[in-house]
Design a protein with these regions (language model features):
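Active-site helix/loop of acyl-thioester processing domains in fatty-acid/polyketide metabolism
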Residues: 118-137
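N-terminal accessory segment detector
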Residues: 1-120, 139-153, 157-163
Length: 163
C-alpha cells in the first residue's frame, strides 16, 4: 500500500456518498461471497494505518498512553470528515462496547443486509481499534456488529498476542 501517496490523491471538496457506498457495498459483497465469514479477517485493516498515514500532516495522531484520548481524536476526526455524528465507547474486562451514530456507511450496510450479507467490517471502528492498539499494546478483533437505522453497536475484543 506504499504506492498510495497523499500527493497522488486528488483533492475534492465533495464526494458522492451514494456512489462511494455502492462501490464499497459491491466490494464487500464480492469479498463475502468468495471468503464467507473469513472476509472479516481480510478487512480488519481497512481504515487503520492507511488513514493515519494519509492524514498525519493534518494532525491525525494517536497517543501511546491513553485509549480515551485516542477515542476522542478518532471521534473528532471522523466528525470533521463528515463520516459520523458521534462515537462513544467503554472498555471493561478487555471488551469494548462501541456506538457509532449517523455513519455515512449505514445505507451500504442496509444494502448488504438486503443481500443477506451480515455486517462484518466497520471502517470507523477499525480506525478506533488502531488507536486502542497504540495505547494499550493489545490486539483487537471486532466480534460483533449490530446495525441500526441511526446507529451501529460494535463489540470489540482486546487481547494480548502471545509470542
Amino acid at each position: 500500500m506504499d504506492n498510495l501517496k497523499k500527493e497522488t490523491m486528488p483533492e475534492r471538496t465533495h464526494m458522492n456518498t451514494k456512489y462511494a457506498n455502492l462501490m464499497l457495498f459491491r466490494l464487500l459483497e464480492v469479498l463475502y461471497d468468495s471468503k464467507g465469514k473469513g472476509a472479516k479477517f481480510r478487512t480488519c485493516i481497512l481504515g487503520k494505518e492507511d488513514i493515519v498515514d494519509h492524514y498525519r500532516d493534518e494532525g491525525l495522531q494517536f497517543s501511546t498512553e491513553s485509549w480515551e484520548e485516542n477515542r476522542d481524536r478518532c471521534r473528532d476526526f471522523l466528525k470533521e470528515q463528515g463520516i459520523i455524528e458521534d462515537l462513544s465507547c467503554n472498555i471493561e474486562n478487555n471488551e469494548a462496547e462501541i456506538t457509532i451514530e449517523s455513519c455515512i456507511h449505514i445505507p451500504m450496510e442496509e444494502m448488504l443486509k438486503n443481500e443477506e450479507v451480515p455486517p462484518y467490517t466497520c471502517i470507523p471502528a477499525n480506525l478506533f481499534a488502531y488507536g486502542v492498539e497504540r495505547a494499550t499494546g493489545k490486539q483487537t478483533e471486532i466480534a460483533k456488529i449490530e446495525t441500526g437505522k441511526d446507529a451501529c453497536k460494535i463489540k470489540m475484543l482486546l487481547f494480548q498476542e502471545e509470542d
